[in-house]
């Protein structure tokens, strides 16, 4: 009897422990969006009161409550069980309860390439009063790039966690997933353990450092776009180990919102945001709404467009596409890394551009050993891993040491053991499983080169030409060389493209602008190995590193915007307009959905002539005209004064934007007419006359474009003029076809009468080819 009772008691205890564990495991982080007005739960204490009313019996506020937001979001974040979430969703005060998403991070001649050289005129006193908010993976504060002699801006309150603020880093706070269960790879501090945040911050505002470089490559002076500006760090991305054992970066949406909350309260001058999520509808994109609140407070946001284009194949992938955000695509620089594989007896080497080899292989040629598959041999070999018919071998005979080894492979991480075994050798790589392009640079801790399928074939032809003798090869150290004469900026294949699938944003051209994002050398934490993800056996450390992506393009745009702000105390939209309308033309004429207005160019950015001003209320009116829900809009922006019910719905509503874009309906052979209304502001003293010019590319893409009036006359600074652009045509089958949409495009340029100023705006009319185009 006693045994049975003890068994029952044990089972009962196990049941309660299991129930408790299950309840904890079922908790997930949610964002609770509140309605505005009409209830008592609007404050932080009100949020906690509401949450306390719906908690399960065995839960406490300490278990559930995470953040209350003031500036960026109307509501709070909490760790909820499914039942608690359901209770909250039924409350009349609550608008929406949604999962906090995990967003993704998007990676010294680049400033010279944009014509912002060391000799460029600067305003150091004003520049040193500017603060950039870098919302990223933290910072390595001990880098020489992050020193400064000038004090923080007047009235600025230094807020630094775990580190001591200095005259360059004037803020450093961290926001980590408080309720999510992860195995942490790093300590909960602002110190950067991935290198991403350090790299980004140094591109924007790193101070001048002589003799910077990367193992002898691209040596020169490293500096940010605004080397005198201050940096406020808001760490939202962390390295963790997930349940499947994989190490990954976690950038939770609730933490990002809290970082934006604090950045707005701190009154920073600009936000640099190199994170994002492949296309998110505006109604669900809470981070974008937080950036609208930042704009209301005079803060421009520069954000990465995303790295989701898959070698230029995927459109409809642009991230951070709200019109109040400056969305930045990644471009190639005017110099390129070239690596040669020299084959003995051959006149021409094999040349690749997707490898960085930092090792000298002296002057000697080395035997080329084919290890595509286990050869029939008595030598002992161990098969490390095999995937889809590709293999990697180790435990080679000593006599094989120092030979070039040719591997076909399916996954880079399979190379780790091979690299460890042959740390003095060289590896030649090739395979069908990787579709590499100029956007990704492979590098390993031994002499190495990557060959794509075509160039691998050339090596095979050489290898098999005469098998009676040993084949010899030599990998040269990578060199940085200028591109061919006449080269103009090109969009990187990884950079995400428009158009925007969201019906509320269909008539906004995104990205806005392109900036250097490929092979960018910038600051790096000395405690972080150069290849933070792969291979596992790379333990090299440097003060600088090479990274690629829209993450690197974004801080270039941030830096140029701050540079302009150091001279002009303009509104966020005026600064954005100046960057867009003074940009340089790019190649791929019909691909504005890849690069927007063009490529950043500092030459004329301080004197754009005219700017397109778009104020906070303009965005509200625009969304109301498109039929946005009043209650949701009030909650998104945190104001009960908005009332869209009195606004007449107009699905052709226009925004005073520096670009002119419209989606016109199919079917084909249907006439269309689109009218754009624009207002420009004169930003110069004196009298000026601007003449309109339509820049057709080849055959005229439209039946007719009428600009009324054809000239604009200004007599004073700040004067505004309004004009209309009427575009008519027929949606024909011979339009340029780009994946799932068809487009026609041209440019409107307002040219000052003496030719000294040009204000360029692209005109893009497009149709999507079917309902699945945006899926």
From Swiss-Prot:
Primary enzyme class: hydrolase
E.C. number(s) listed in UniProt: 3.4.21.-
Location(s) in or outside the cell: Secreted
GO cellular component terms, semicolon-separated: extracellular region
Pfam family, one: Peptidase_S8
Segments forming domain Peptidase S8: 110-606
Entry keyword rRNA processing: no
Residues glycosylated per entry: 24, 115, 126, 162, 437, 601
GO BP of this protein: proteolysis
Signal peptide: 1-23
Superkingdom of origin: Eukaryota
Record's protein name: Subtilisin-like protease SBT4.1
Organism (species): Arabidopsis thaliana (Mouse-ear cress)
Organism lineage string: Eukaryota, Viridiplantae, Streptophyta, Embryophyta, Tracheophyta
């Amino acid at each position: 009897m006693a045994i049975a009772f003890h068994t029952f008691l044990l089972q009962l205890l196990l049941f309660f422990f299991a129930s408790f564990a299950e309840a904890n495991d079922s908790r997930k982080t949610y964002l609770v969006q509140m309605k505005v007005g009409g209830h008592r739960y609007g404050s932080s204490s009100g949020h906690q009161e509401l949450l306390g009313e719906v908690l399960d019996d065995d839960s406490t506020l300490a278990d559930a409550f995470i953040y209350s937001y003031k500036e960026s979001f109307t509501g709070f974040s909490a760790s909820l069980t499914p039942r608690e979430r359901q209770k909250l969703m039924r409350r009349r005060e609550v608008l929406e309860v949604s999962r906090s998403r995990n967003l993704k991070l998007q990676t010294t001649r680049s400033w010279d390439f944009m014509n912002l050289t060391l000799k460029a005129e600067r305003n150091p006193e004003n520049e040193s009063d500017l603060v950039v908010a870098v919302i990223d993976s933290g910072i390595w504060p001990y880098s020489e790039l992050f020193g400064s002699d000038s004090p923080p801006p007047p009235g600025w309150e230094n807020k630094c966690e775990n580190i001591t603020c200095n005259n360059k880093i004037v803020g450093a706070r961290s926001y980590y997933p408080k309720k999510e269960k992860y195995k942490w790879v790093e300590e909960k501090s602002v110190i950067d353990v991935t290198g991403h945040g350090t790299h980004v911050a140094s591109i924007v505002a790193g101070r001048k450092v002589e003799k910077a470089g990367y193992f002898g490559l691209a040596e020169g002076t490293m500096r940010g776009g605004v080397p005198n500006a201050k940096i406020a760090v808001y760490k939202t991305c962390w390295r963790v180990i997930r349940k499947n054992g994989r190490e990954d970066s976690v950038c939770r949406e609730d933490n990002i919102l809290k970082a934006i909350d604090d950045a707005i309260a701190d009154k920073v001058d600009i936000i640099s945001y190199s994170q994002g999520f492949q296309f998110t509808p505006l109604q669900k994109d809470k981070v974008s709404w937080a950036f609208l609140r930042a704009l209301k407070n005079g803060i421009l946001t520069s954000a990465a467009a995303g790295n989701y284009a898959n070698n230029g194949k995927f459109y409809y992938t642009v991230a951070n596409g709200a019109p109040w955000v400056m969305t930045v695509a990644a471009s190639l620089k005017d110099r390129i890394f070239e690596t040669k594989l020299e084959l003995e007896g051959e006149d021409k080497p094999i040349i690749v551009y997707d490898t960085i080899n930092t090792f000298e292989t002296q002057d000697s040629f080395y035997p080329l050993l084919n290890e595509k598959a286990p050869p029939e041999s008595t030598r002992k070999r161990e098969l490390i891993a095999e995937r889809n018919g590709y293999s990697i071998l180790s435990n080679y005979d000593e006599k094989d040491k120092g030979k070039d080894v040719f591997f076909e492979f399916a996954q880079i991480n399979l190379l780790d053991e091979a690299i460890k075994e042959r740390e003095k050798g060289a590896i030649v790589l090739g395979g069908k499983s990787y579709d590499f392009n100029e956007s990704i640079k492979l590098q390993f801790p031994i002499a190495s080169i990557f060959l794509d399928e075509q160039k691998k074939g050339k090596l095979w032809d050489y290898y098999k030409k005469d098998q009676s003798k040993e084949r010899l090869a030599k990998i040269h150290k990578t060199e940085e060389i200028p591109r061919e004469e006449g080269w103009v900026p090109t969009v990187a294949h990884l950079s995400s493209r428009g158009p925007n699938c969201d019906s509320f944003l269909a008539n906004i051209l995104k990205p806005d602008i392109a900036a250097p994002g490929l092979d960018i050398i910038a600051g790096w934490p000395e405690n972080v190995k150069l290849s933070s993800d792969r291979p596992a056996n790379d333990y090299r450390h440097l003060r600088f590193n090479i990274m690629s992506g829209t993450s690197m393009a974004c801080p270039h745009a941030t830096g140029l915007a701050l540079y302009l702000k150091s001279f002009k105390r303009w509104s966020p939209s005026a600064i954005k307009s100046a960057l867009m309308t003074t940009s340089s033309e790019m190649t791929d004429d019909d691909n504005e959905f890849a690069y927007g207005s063009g490529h950043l160019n500092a030459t004329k950015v301080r004197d754009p002539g005219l700017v397109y001003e778009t104020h906070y209320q303009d965005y509200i009116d625009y969304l109301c005209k498109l039929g946005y829900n009043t209650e949701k809009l009030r909650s998104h922006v945190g104001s009960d004064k908005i009332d869209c019910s009195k606004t007449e719905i107009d699905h052709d509503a226009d925004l005073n934007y520096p670009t002119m874009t419209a989606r016109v309906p199919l079917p084909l052979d249907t006439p269309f007419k689109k009218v754009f209304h624009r207002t420009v502001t004169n930003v110069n003293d004196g009298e000026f006359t601007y003449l309109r010019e339509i820049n057709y590319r080849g055959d005229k893409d439209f039946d007719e474009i009428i600009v009324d009036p054809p000239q604009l006359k200004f007599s004073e600074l700040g004067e505004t003029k309004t004009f209309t652009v009427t575009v008519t045509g027929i949606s024909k089958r011979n339009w340029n076809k780009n994946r799932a949409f068809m487009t026609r495009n041209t440019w409107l340029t307002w040219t000052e009468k003496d030719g000294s100023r040009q204000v360029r705006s692209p005109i893009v009319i497009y149709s999507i080819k079917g309902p699945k185009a945006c899926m």
